[in-house]
From Swiss-Prot:
PANTHER family: COILED-COIL-HELIX-COILED-COIL-HELIX DOMAIN-CONTAINING PROTEIN 7. It is found in: Mitochondrion intermembrane space. The keyword Mitochondrion applies. A motif (Cx9C motif 2) lies at residues 37-47. Disulfide bonds join C16-C47, C26-C37. This is Coiled-coil-helix-coiled-coil-helix domain-containing protein 7. It comes from the Eukaryota.
Length: 85
């Protein structure tokens, strides 16, 4: 597996791994009809936007690492009480 692909599959680096997998699975099941999978694409897009804003906020505040680990992300989502995307 190439290094870039390995990084994208790492849950500590990619916060939207489950959304990405769901959209790919939807495409596979629906013969790559993108219109049928638009809700999955939208959820993935919102996930990326949400975690990007968290990452930028942490970077501005000087928190390292900029992207929270998978465990930290679980705590953030639990504290919010619901999925923001």
């Amino acid at each position: 597996m190439p290094v870039v692909t390995g990084r994208l599959r790492d849950p500590d680096i990619n916060p939207c791994l489950s959304e990405s997998d769901a959209s790919t699975r939807c495409l596979d099941e629906n013969n790559y009809d993108k219109e049928r999978c638009s809700t999955y694409f939208l959820k993935y897009k919102n996930c990326r936007k949400f975690w990007h804003s968290i990452m930028m906020q942490r970077r501005r505040n000087g928190v390292k690492p900029c992207m929270p680990t998978a465990a930290e992300r679980d705590e953030i989502l639990r504290a919010m009480g619901k999925m923001p995307y």
